[in-house]
Amino acid sequence: MNAIIVTGGDIDLSLLENYIAENKEDVIISVDAAITKLEKINVTPHIMVGDFDTLSDEERLKKYENLNVEIVKHDPIKDFSDSELAVDRAVKDGIRNIVVFGALGKRFDHAFANILILQKYKKLGADITIYDRYNKIYVISNHFKLEREKLWGKYISFFSLEGKNFMDKLEGVKYPIKNRIIDNIATPSLYISNEIKDDKLEAAFSGDLLVVESRD
């Protein structure tokens, strides 16, 4: 079982609508006011999670309760964002493959926290991918292969989530790398905007890396 989490950031509604249409068996979780975006594409979620501070509409919540949507309401004063609570709910339900729409947008603090959430739950056995119109973002551990035809856009970038990682090899790309340190302080931009040149990319490295597949 997989989950689609829809949060309150910027969303390409056509991208979201197409993804939901292609993954009809997935559990859909709406976070706080993201329900207004799902309404625009006529999608009813299975679960709604949040403190609903940006959706002070009891009538709307009652409507979804009557549609047998599970409403999980949290106190606005809490130690976790609504997005993290939605991910946590999915993981506690045994879901290990999660995609998130709306995790990026105007609020960089929320966007950055959402990226860090990827690593937290990777260590708990869950694979989470953030999508927007231009980016596909996820965490990988130790080794990685990606076929060129499956790349989200033209570019692929790698970032350390541990301060430093050792890259044994990065092959099949425009800028191959062998036996180098990925260092957020010394070389923060060394691993950005690479391109797959062979049929596939292959990488071997220590620890966890954040991967960003991008298009212009």
PLM features per residue range, with description:
Residues 108-119:
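Short Gly/Thr/Asp-enriched flexible loops that form oxyanion-binding sites at enzyme active sites
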Residues 119-148:
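Class I SAM-dependent methyltransferase SAM-binding "motif I" and its flanking Rossmann-like core
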Residues 1-64:
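N-terminal beta-strand-loop-alpha-helix module at the start
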Residues 140-216:
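Long, charged alpha-helical interface segments
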Residues 71-92:
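Short phosphate-binding loop-to-helix
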Residues 67-75, 125-129, 154-159:
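A glycine-rich helix N-cap at a beta->alpha junction
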Residues 6, 29-32, 72-73, 129-132:
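General beta-strand structural signal in soluble alpha/beta enzymes
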